[in-house]
UniProtKB/Swiss-Prot annotation:
PROSITE patterns: RIBOSOMAL_L36. GO terms for cellular component: ribonucleoprotein complex; ribosome. The lineage of its organism: Bacteria, Pseudomonadati, Bacteroidota, Flavobacteriia, Flavobacteriales. Pfam families: Ribosomal_L36. Belongs to the bacterial ribosomal protein bL36 family. SUPFAM superfamilies: Ribosomal protein L36. This is Large ribosomal subunit protein bL36. GO terms for biological process: translation. Keywords: Ribonucleoprotein, Ribosomal protein. GO terms for molecular function: structural constituent of ribosome.
Length: 38
């Protein structure tokens, strides 16, 4: 999981999700693309 200041989709399968007031990117096909903001 990378912590970043600006989220960017690294592939078309990435989805932006808001959990507990923090934005995340999840990708079920390629889990190494996970990102978190905040």
């Amino acid at each position: 999981m990378k912590k970043v200041t600006s989220l960017k989709k690294r592939s078309d399968n990435c989805k932006i999700v808001k959990r507990k007031g923090c934005l995340r990117i999840i990708n079920k096909l390629n889990p190494k693309f996970k990102q978190k903001q905040g």
